[in-house]
């Protein structure tokens, strides 16, 4: 018995759909939308993962406009494993002697190394590293398998082949200032070719309380005056150390940013912060361009930008009650501008916007108190 096999007319009219596994839905998305998504991703490690997905992703990532680089680790100066200068992001601080001439030295040398941990991140070094050529995706991908161990790349190297960055944020793993538990110390500095301004907020202790207070109705029993004990019990000396330490940390960060700023002329804004929230250095487009045109003046003592002569304003409260019930002991706010600056040191809008909440509220409360003027020479 024989059978006659005939083709199904229905299958000819309505063929089987293409297998989903052989169709890339990302091909339907325009490049502009993918770049918008990559801008939201921002983190350079996650962008490294994206590069492995496809050739198209690989080719688009260098055109991302918003980039975040998180520095993974801090390696001390005597760490012999980091002897290669091409794989360092160094931050140097200088020594500080107190007014009494004691050898109260604040000195530290850090090497901040961007160190990818997982295997996929090693491809980012191939894509964005300084020695990368226009090799194909397959060649770059095979380089991952040939890599042995974990390579280390500085932020400068990682950012080398990003050509369209407009907003760049680099985050250090910790703040540079070693402070005791319970002490509050925060700073924010703006730089051009030199320091434009700096704000420092500190407190000797922070006491958390469950009782909510209305600071609008509170009255300063001391009329905003600094008590005599502030000068005799080391309070003033401590604030001077806070101020100089913060300025040194800020100027060291600024010094290290110069090669990145020169390399990426598309930058509109640059922020260098730390995971502890201790200090923030900011530069806008005008300040970035100023640094490119006017080379910075380096300190002879260490690898940092020279701090110019300064005018400072200080506000102090022995005890400050915040609206949420938190109590700050020895609350201090210092506003700093170069002596040659034409801008007013006590500009209210600048002072109130320097810190995020709740610290912005602290600054607003302190500037209502009596203002004390100080000066500092260049260092």
Curated annotation (Swiss-Prot):
Alphabetical list of InterPro entries matching this protein: AUF1-like, F-box-like_dom_sf, F-box_dom
Domain F-box: 24-72
Domain of life: Eukaryota
Pfam families attached to this UniProt entry: F-box-like
Gene3D superfamilies attached to this UniProt entry: 1.20.1280.50
Protein name (database record): F-box protein At1g30200
